[in-house]
């Protein structure tokens, strides 16, 4: 399991006031999917808390060095699923003088080091759907796209059947 952690208060020397850049690093928790399902939620939360406590200036610098050393080959976390929620980061609220952004997207799908990250993203500031929901950005290997499409079609079909049954 991997999550993104804000490190703006951890780096030494501190970042300058008003710094506007990436201040997140991926943090990993070694946990098999079966263990995640079988364990109580409190046990998983304790693992996440412990992993957060291990992140310090040295961790951040090591992460930056690793990124620089392996930039050309791409960074991968192997068989890790990464989920990150960007809905409340505030990117959609920033006004550069011409209003809020129309879209907020990651620059790279490899931003978390995962081969298949999933981002929960807000709609743009002017988008009416913003109040009712959010976008899901999923990065898949090309070989998985067809199966993903089939799964989504099946999900939509089931949803349409359920909503039409409710109207009878």
Predicted segments — roles?
Residues 1-168:
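Acyl-CoA-dependent O-acyltransferases
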């Amino acid at each position: 399991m991997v999550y993104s952690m804000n490190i703006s208060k951890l780096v030494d020397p501190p970042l300058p006031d008003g710094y506007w850049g990436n201040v997140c690093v991926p943090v990993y928790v070694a946990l098999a999917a079966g263990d995640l399902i079988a364990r109580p939620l409190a046990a998983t939360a304790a693992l996440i808390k412990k992993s957060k406590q291990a992140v310090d200036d040295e961790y951040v610098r090591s992460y930056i060095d690793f990124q620089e050393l392996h930039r050309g080959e791409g960074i991968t976390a192997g068989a890790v699923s990464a989920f990150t929620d960007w809905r409340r980061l505030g990117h959609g609220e920033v006004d550069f003088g011409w209003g809020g952004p129309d879209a907020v997207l990651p620059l790279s799908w490899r931003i978390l080091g995962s081969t298949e990250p999933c981002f929960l993203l807000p709609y743009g500031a002017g988008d009416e759907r913003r109040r009712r929901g959010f976008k899901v950005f999923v990065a898949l290997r090309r070989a998985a796209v067809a199966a993903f499409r089939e799964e989504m079609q099946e999900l939509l079909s089931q949803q349409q059947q359920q909503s039409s049954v409710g109207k009878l």
